[in-house]
């Protein structure tokens, strides 16, 4: 159990997902194993949440739950994956599900985990030791969830080639996640459809997780403005074929 000061208590009660090293008043006599779950309480002992402990980061605890009755077994994580996917389906047009962010880190209470879906490939970035420890629970379950919903998943690529991992004591690297009983895909290139435009996405070598999904609505706005015109994009990263923008 980690006891925190009044400042951290206010932040956590307000929804903040992190506990910083300098906000901790009392820690266990023996430090927990790196990446394991610990409880966080106020100065007076009030339960504030449970999260992953990190011995290397200044973010000492990343919360995953504020419910003292939760049991953190595989079923817990499967429910959270299901909720995140169902939420995306509820707020997005069906056509947008071809390429979308499924897991958005702390916003989905998966601290340090990003999962982007590019048609039949998942691009995964793990930035916290807690998520690293349970990825073998999460990733096969997520592939199974999507397949059961009619979305063929050919493979999962780990895009852990980011320096931020070193702050958690994790190595950098990238490569295919070994789904049980499945061979690694032959190619990390896939075709997605966004706003009616087809793009070839290189999930392994594209910037960040492979493609700037957060620019979807900006590209849609540019398409409306550029209709009937020839457009020169001086900062072009991805080229679509066919394209509605008339890019040269």
Where are these regions (language model features)?
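Non-catalytic substrate-recognition/targeting regions of SAM-dependent transferases
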Residues: 103-116, 135-211
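Glycine-rich helix-loop-beta junction characteristic of Rossmann-like nucleotide cofactor-binding loops
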Residues: 221-227
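Conserved class I S-adenosyl-L-methionine
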Residues: 228-235
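Non-catalytic accessory regions of SAM-dependent methyltransferases
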Residues: 1-119
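A short interface-forming secondary-structure element
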Residues: 119-132
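Conserved hydrophobic/aromatic pocket- or pore-lining residues that grip, position, or stack substrates
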Residues: 120, 199, 218, 235
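Single conserved hydrophobic/aromatic residue that forms the stacking wall/gate
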Residues: 237-248
């Amino acid at each position: 159990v980690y006891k925190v000061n009044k400042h951290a208590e206010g932040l956590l009660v307000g929804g903040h997902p992190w506990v910083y090293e300098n906000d901790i008043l009392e820690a266990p006599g023996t430090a927990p194993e790196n990446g394991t779950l610990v409880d966080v309480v106020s100065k007076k002992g009030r339960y504030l949440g449970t999260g992953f402990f990190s011995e290397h980061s200044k973010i000492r605890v990343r919360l995953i739950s504020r419910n003292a009755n939760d049991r953190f077994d595989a079923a817990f994580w499967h429910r959270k994956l299901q909720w995140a996917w169902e939420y995306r389906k509820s707020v997005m047009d069906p056509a947008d599900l071809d390429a979308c962010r499924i897991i958005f880190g702390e916003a989905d209470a998966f601290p340090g985990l990003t999962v982007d879906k590019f048609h039949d490939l998942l691009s995964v970035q793990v930035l916290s030791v807690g998520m690293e420890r349970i990825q073998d629970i999460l990733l096969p379950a997520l592939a199974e969830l999507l397949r059961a919903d009619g979305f063929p998943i050919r493979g999962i690529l780990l895009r852990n080639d980011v320096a931020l991992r070193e702050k958690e004591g994790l190595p950098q690297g990238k490569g295919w996640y070994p789904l049980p009983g499945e061979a690694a895909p032959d190619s990390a290139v896939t075709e997605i459809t966004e706003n009616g435009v087809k793009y070839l996405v290189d999930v392994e070598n594209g910037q960040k997780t492979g493609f700037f999904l957060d620019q979807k609505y900006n590209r849609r706005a540019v398409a409306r403005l550029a209709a009937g015109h020839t457009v020169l994009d001086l900062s072009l990263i991805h080229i679509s074929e066919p394209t509605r923008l008339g890019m040269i």
